[in-house]
Amino acid sequence: MAEHNELGKKGEELAVEYLRLKEYEILELNYRYQKAEVDIIAKRGNTLIAAEVKTRSTPEFGNPQDFVKPKQIQQLVKAVNHYVEEGELDVEVRFDIIAIIKNKAGTKIEHIQDAFFYF
C-alpha cells in the first residue's frame, strides 16, 4: 500500500477513535453510493453526522480541510441523502470535517462541525 494510503487509513482510524471518545455512535465506515464515499457516518442524539476525514503529514501545502472540493461536497450530500431516505431516518444531518496532521512530531486533530451546508 502506498504511504499516502496508509496515512489516510490511519487518519480514519484516529477519527473513529476520537468520535467514540466524544460519545458518537459509529454507524458506517466508508459508505459508498454511486461515485461518492462517506468516510464516517455517525450519530449523536438525533443528529446524523457525515464526516469527511482529511489527513496530511504536514500543513505546508495547506490545511487538510482545504482539500475538500465543491464536487466532492456535492457527491457527499447525494450519498447522505440516499442513506437517510433508504433508512427512512428522521434526523438532523450535519456535515463535519475531521482534519488530521500526523507526523513524527505528533498528531493534531481538528473537528470542524457544520463544515459545509447543503441545499
Curated annotation (Swiss-Prot):
SUPFAM superfamilies: Restriction endonuclease-like. Pfam families: UPF0102. CDD domains: PoNe_Nuclease. GO terms for molecular function: nucleic acid binding. Transmembrane segments: none annotated. It comes from the Bacteria. Gene3D superfamilies: 3.40.1350.10. Signal peptide: none annotated. Belongs to the UPF0102 family. HAMAP family: UPF0102 (MF_00048). This is UPF0102 protein GFO_3098.
